[in-house]
Amino acid sequence: MLTINETRLLNRIHALGAVGIDADGRRTRLAASDEDKAGRDLVSRWMREAGLTVVTDYIGNLFGIWTPEGCAETEPVMTGSHIDTVINAGQFDGCYGVLAALEVVETLKASGFVPARPIAVVAFTNEEGVRYAPDMLGSLVYAGGYPLEQALATVGTDGAVLGKELKRIGYAGTVAPGFLKPCAFVEAHIEQGPILETEGITIGAVEDLQGISWQRITIEGEQNHAGTTPTVYRADAGLAAAKVMTFLRSRCELPGSRTVATTGCIAFEPNAINVIPGKAVFTVDVRNPDAAQLCAEEQALADYLTELEKTDRVKITTERLSRFAPVLFDEGIVRLVEDSAAARSLSCRRMTSGAGQDAQMLARICPTAMIFVPSVRGISHNPLELTHDADVAAGANVLLDVVAQLAAK
């Protein structure tokens, strides 16, 4: 049975992981930054050394394309992920999917395999969304879900315009996003959660992806003295915010619920120890893999906020920041993942992706699925992020099988 070169793949993961380390030892490659350029340059070099045609589109998505003779007009199989990172990141998130994809192509080429269609390795721009919003921007533009000009005009957290930054680092591209129309997309990725490791399973066949609803909620009460204002007379914006958070947790704990909810950002005004908050501003991240259930959670929150205004004598306004519907991946490709795992005697289970991924955007335009490998202790977006070498190789070998079967058709 054909297998990837584990040593080469691991060496590349570590080499790319060494790019963007600052003086404090923190790994950060924000989209379109100098550090991102250095990572792109390295991956581009590896693509060229593998004999691939390297192309960048106008949003900065980077492609390495293998086009065997006679199939240039055939829709390609596409595989990859992203190489931009969060601040103080691990070395596997996204990078594993890009480098596993490159390893798959090199292995297939060396084996004498002749695909019936091109195979394209891709590193999408700004998946993390740390510097530029929204996240998964490169794949979203590629799939036609966001206007190119609007994306290029996006202003980053540092005031830099994305289009200008892509030009500055030399990755503004020469072709329009969507120039390749894939017949299928497969993304290998670390799980970024604890399920596979906890259950002792090597491969996750990802069958769907949670819908995501982001809101910013502003609660206005009455700023007042913490010592002289009796509880009954208070319009405490801080307390009202806390009630919203506990309400969301209670929804997650309902029997059979698949909802998860997070308040990741919060600010009180005036933010003083002896002053009742007159204002609270916080974010809400609600996720569920079922479209109807996600809508139900959004409505339940809206109803609760309406009631809370009355009971706590506060004014509440909401702002939608982002919303992505749940995604159901292609059953045929999910089965290919399961079949490959079985053929290689690897334990496997079907899974839901709890995180947003580039694959959810590609699912808009072609059959798509994902392959998960275990994350040690479920840790990600953290320098402690780790996937064991054997699992790295196992996931890449499953990707090898799936890509080969899709490209042979």
Please name every model-derived segment.
Residues 60, 83-85, 119-130, 192, ...:
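Acidic, glycine-rich active-site loops and adjacent beta-strand->loop/helix elements
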Residues 9-22, 80-81, 348-398, 406:
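Zn-dependent metallopeptidase/amidohydrolase metal-coordination segment
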Residues 79, 88-128, 213-219, 225-251, ...:
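Alpha-helical metal-binding/catalytic segments enriched in His/Glu/Asp
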Residues 3-89:
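Acidic/His- and Gly-rich active-site-bordering loop/insert found
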Residues 29-31, 262-271, 283-290, 315-334, ...:
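A short beta-alpha structural unit
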Residues 207, 225, 229-255, 300-301, ...:
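His/Asp/Glu-rich mid-to-C-terminal helical/loop segments that flank catalytic regions of hydrolases
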Residues 127, 131-291:
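Midchain, well-structured core segments that form catalytic/ion-binding scaffolds
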Residues 57, 114-118, 173-177, 228, ...:
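Flexible, glycine/charged-enriched surface loops at secondary-structure junctions
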